[in-house]
Amino acid sequence: MVSGGRVGGGEGEAGEAAEVAVAMVDNEEEMAQAQAPPAAAVAARELVVGYALTSKKAKSFLQPKLRGLARKKGILFVAIDQKRPLSDQGPFDIVLHKLTGREWQQLLEEYREEHPEVTVLDPPGAIEHLLNRQSMLQEVSELDLSDCHGRVGVPKQLFVNTDPSSIPAAVMRAGLSLPLVAKPLVAKSHELSLAYDPISLTKLEPPLVLQEFVNHGGVLFKVYIVGDAIRVVRRFSLPNVDVGDLSNNAGVFRFPRVSCASANADDADLDPHVAELPPRPLLEILARELRRRLGLRLFNIDMIREHGTRDRFYVIDMNYFPGYGKMPGYEHVFTDFLLSLVQKEYKRRPSYSSCEG
């Protein structure tokens, strides 16, 4: 708008009209630029990512290659002091976290309400769904992906929270077949056991989830999801179990985890039918549906292919904010993802060049 101008006649009036028109055009251009800033303007502004991670998680995730690339792209990681109110820190564009506990969740929810402009990865309420193995795979079981380049399901499973001596009878009633994989109810632990016979079931320690073991050629597919990006890594897993194994083995065999990062199977000489990755269209549909249903953007899926089939897959586990540091090229995927979260309207933040955690 033009203020303080005098309305007159003739050339003066036409001149002022022209000035008003120019001012309106300038204002429209400024508004358009504010709504959709050029890439150069975005790159010139620091993207501040506050992180609240355990020391172990911070070390594995914030590797030098991630920090270095992030600095080049204008992304700054700042450690959040859990002993201070979140509102007294920052300001942040994004809060990245993987902490548990009701107190932290409440603090984070209050912060989200006070600062809706900040992206929190991910909402505490959504994360809860993946912390309990009783409900973790429910969303997968409800999907209908039968016509999506393959079939995806979950193994038959049973939640057990009773006296161990009653487990064999509960397994029989549920119609589960041995061997069974026993997993802790709380997903923070990756330890699991393989029980071969009914007697061994009585040696398990509830609460836990029992899952039918599906032969899968000893190869597991770790599907990493970072926003819209999907990356798949092959890992060696538990070998097939045949009838002879069932008759010759007894007891409970404990494993630290199903797969091991050091046992990468991508370069191994494997049977092509075992090593073939799940179809890309199937993974894209599965990831999209789970993102929508779970309300999460950072998680991974452990998938197996039933041995002897080409298109029958099972999801056996899911994890929030998994070990992305083990994913090849994760620093490029993750920094691109963080930049994609920047909102269209940018507010100038103070410099944090001396505050990097």
Swiss-Prot record:
Binds 2 magnesium ions per subunit. It is an enzyme of class 2 (transferase). Its cofactor is Mg(2+). InterPro entries: Inositol_tetrakis-P_1-kinase, InsP(3)kin_ATP-grasp, ITPK1_N. Pfam families: Ins134_P3_kin, Ins134_P3_kin_N. Its EC number is 2.7.1.134, 2.7.1.159. One of its GO terms (molecular function) is inositol-1,3,4-trisphosphate 5-kinase activity. This is Inositol-tetrakisphosphate 1-kinase 3. It comes from Oryza sativa subsp. japonica.
